[in-house]
């Protein structure tokens, strides 16, 4: 198991680099509105779970973004391998972050509560 501080630093570095790659290197329109919200690394630093959000609430846009990220994962991993100073570049797993949608839902509930009073 890796040092937790090292894993945290590496996760931040992966998040910064993936964000940079999505903005500058990936030209796929499906990932145009994707924002990387956080990265979690497995204990052995072999798997990076990348959480992302998109501006649209439509399910079809979420599926398109997921497909675009999966299609670009090979290029992203290759570029990460050149940028990171680790023995083995982690495998990338993209997961849509639901916290933004949940936050919007809570905000709507609070607004309704205030409107009723």
Swiss-Prot record:
Checking SUPFAM superfamilies in the record gives: Ribosome-binding factor A, RbfA (SSF89919)
What PROSITE patterns does the annotation carry?
A: RBFA
Q: Name one Pfam family in it.
A: RBFA
Alphabetically, the GO molecular function entries are: ribosomal small subunit binding
Principal localisation: cytoplasm
InterPro entries named in the record: KH_dom-like_a/b, RbfA, RbfA_dom_sf, Ribosome-bd_factorA_CS
A GO BP term here is: maturation of SSU-rRNA
Which is a Gene Ontology cellular component entry for this protein? cytosol
Q: Give the range the annotation lists for the signal sequence.
A: none
Keyword field: Cytoplasm, Ribosome biogenesis
Subcellular location field: Cytoplasm
Assigned protein family:
Belongs to the RbfA family.
How it assembles, according to the record, is: Monomer. Binds 30S ribosomal subunits, but not 50S ribosomal subunits or 70S ribosomes.
Physiological role: One of several proteins that assist in the late maturation steps of the functional core of the 30S ribosomal subunit. Associates with free 30S ribosomal subunits (but not with 30S subunits that are part of 70S ribosomes or polysomes). Required for efficient processing of 16S rRNA. May interact with the 5'-terminal helix region of 16S rRNA.
Task: Kindly provide the name given to this protein in its UniProt entry.
Answer: Ribosome-binding factor A
- Protein's organism: Leuconostoc citreum (strain KM20)
Instruction: Provide the gene name from the record.
Output: rbfA
